[in-house]
Amino acid sequence: MTRYKATIAYDGTDFAGFQSQTNQRTVQEEIEKVLSKLNSFEPVILQGSGRTDSGVHAFGQVIHFDLNGKARDLERLRFGLDTQTPADIAVKKVELVPDDWHARYQKHEKTYEYYLENSVTRSPFHRHSKAYFRYPLNFERMQGAMVKLVGQHDFTGFTASGSSVDDKVRTIYQAEIIQLDKENFKFIFRGNGFLYKQVRNMVGTVIKIGNDRMPVSQIDKILTSKNRNFAGPTAAPEGLYLKEVKYEPINEI
């Protein structure tokens, strides 16, 4: 058996998320179908760096999987995966990794981007690739809120109730908002890990602050109280992208 690491991109619009689910179309299931063909039709179970929810996209999700036999030509393997998976999945890179390398448990940091259209009418061309908010937003207020998210915090107040993780302390290295033009914003979050729906809950809160329906100091209150009820709504999934998963260098195999 040989272990491979792959970097993939996908349009999450027509998926019920990344992780396999019964009677649902998922990214994991579609890739595993192709991997099985390339593995003499023996089942292959892949592991991802983490899951993304229904409607969430990825520029740089990372997976690993094992295939029978010796190491294969990496470009041929990448090409085979890329051309046989559906059009809403792209396989960007395939690498060899040690047998004990794990996409989820290897030390890494993740970067998410969130795209928001802020206009009177929503563009029909971006309805699956950007979130939408029609009411006025104050850029300076949102900037002030984002700064407060940087650092090591207990993010319980920004976690969905379905989270089963006990330790909710995470470190955010970068929390930035960029005004791309008068109608479009990009949020950037880079950290050592994120809880279930944490990014979308943070974005929903910052939007509410930008719309002057919460004070900038609300961020402090949420972090201190660890109370989800003090945070804003969960932002829509279509604006969220897993941009990059960055690992420590792999030793030569």
UniProtKB/Swiss-Prot annotation:
Q: Known catalysed reaction(s)?
A: uridine(38/39/40) in tRNA = pseudouridine(38/39/40) in tRNA
Molecular function per GO:
RNA binding; tRNA pseudouridine(38-40) synthase activity
A GO biological process held by the record: tRNA pseudouridine synthesis
Q: Which Pfam families match?
A: PseudoU_synth_1
**EC no.?**
5.4.99.12
* List of residues binding substrate: 112
Write out the entry's keywords from A to Z. Answer: Isomerase, tRNA processing
Instruction: Say which domain of life the source belongs to.
Output: Bacteria
Gene3D superfamilies membership = Pseudouridine synthase I, catalytic domain, C-terminal subdomain, Pseudouridine synthase I, catalytic domain, N-terminal subdomain
Which positions are catalytic residues?
53 (nucleophile)
Answer yes or no on keyword Cytoplasm.
Answer: no
Assembly and binders? Homodimer.
User: Which NCBIfam families does this UniProt record tie to the protein?
Assistant: hisT_truA
Q: Which family does it belong to?
A: Belongs to the tRNA pseudouridine synthase TruA family.
Please describe what this protein does. Answer: Formation of pseudouridine at positions 38, 39 and 40 in the anticodon stem and loop of transfer RNAs.
> What's the protein here called?
tRNA pseudouridine synthase A
Give the organism, scientific name. Lactococcus lactis subsp. cremoris (strain MG1363)
